[in-house]
UniProtKB/Swiss-Prot annotation:
Pfam families: IGPD (PF00475)
Amino-acid biosynthesis is among the record's keywords: yes
Reaction it catalyzes: D-erythro-1-(imidazol-4-yl)glycerol 3-phosphate = 3-(imidazol-4-yl)-2-oxopropyl phosphate + H2O
UniProt cross-references to HAMAP family, sorted A to Z: HisB
GO molecular function: imidazoleglycerol-phosphate dehydratase activity
GO biological-process terms attached to the record: L-histidine biosynthetic process
Family matches, as PROSITE patterns: IGP_DEHYDRATASE_1 (PS00954), IGP_DEHYDRATASE_2 (PS00955)
InterPro entries from the UniProt entry: IGPD_sf (IPR038494), ImidazoleglycerolP_deHydtase (IPR000807), ImidazoleglycerP_deHydtase_CS (IPR020565), Ribosomal_Su5_D2-typ_SF (IPR020568)
Superkingdom of this protein's organism: Bacteria
Name of the featured protein: Imidazoleglycerol-phosphate dehydratase
Key words of the record: Amino-acid biosynthesis, Cytoplasm, Histidine biosynthesis, Lyase
Length: 197
């Protein structure tokens, strides 16, 4: 099996982002982003997706977190697209339900080649610590647009905003893990009746 790894750098006047990813990892993670709550959520992707992630970002945090959060999502999406390659032998679809106390979220993903995000998370607070929770929409939109995936995110219940968000990211990690899994029965085959994705 060839290694499914990628390194992507993205530099703008607002941020400089570096992402290293191993899709067949063990869940190791290292972050130097400067947004602790985002780093905590990215750790859920690595741990529950069994994906090794190393992300550095030098962003304009003196303004706010917006550009950093969005650009990390964009660059992570680019890294996924690069690491996955031609998608042959890949399961393609993934889904997961994850609870955390009173909160429950569902995430469904399709590495379809068609970017689309449908996200319904009725946050009970606008801010967790100092983090504006609306920025997670920007993170996932950036990821979707550049990983070229269809992604459905639904928080089905929850009263604690931290729990709502954490269940989303844990479910996202587990859905990714399912979707990127290589199926030996599909070795060398495209997971589509069209023959391409």
């Amino acid at each position: 099996m060839s290694e499914r790894t990628a390194y992507v750098e993205r530099n703008t006047l607002e941020t400089q982002v570096k992402v290293t990813i191993n899709l067949d990892g063990t869940g190791k993670a290292r972050f130097a982003i400067g947004v602790p709550f985002l780093e905590h959520m990215l750790d859920q992707i690595a741990r529950h997706g069994l994906i090794d992630l190393d992300i550095e970002c030098n962003g304009d945090l003196h303004i706010d977190d917006h550009h950093t959060v969005e650009d990390v999502g964009i660059t992570l999406g680019q890294a996924f697209a690069k690491a996955i390659g031609d998608k042959k032998g890949m399961t393609r679809y993934g889904h997961a339900y994850v609870p955390l106390d009173e909160a429950l979220s569902r995430v469904v993903i399709d590495f379809s080649g068609r970017p689309g995000l449908t996200m319904h998370v009725p946050y009970t607070r606008a801010v967790v610590g100092k983090f504006d929770v609306d920025l997670f929409q920007e993170f996932f939109q950036g990821f979707v647009n550049h990983a070229l995936v269809t992604l459905h995110i639904d928080n089905l219940r929850g009263t604690n905003t931290h729990h709502q968000i954490e269940t989303v990211f844990k479910a996202f990690g587990r859905a990714l893990r399912m979707a990127i899994e290589l199926d030996p029965r599909m070795a060398g085959q495209m997971p589509s009746t069209k023959g391409c994705l």
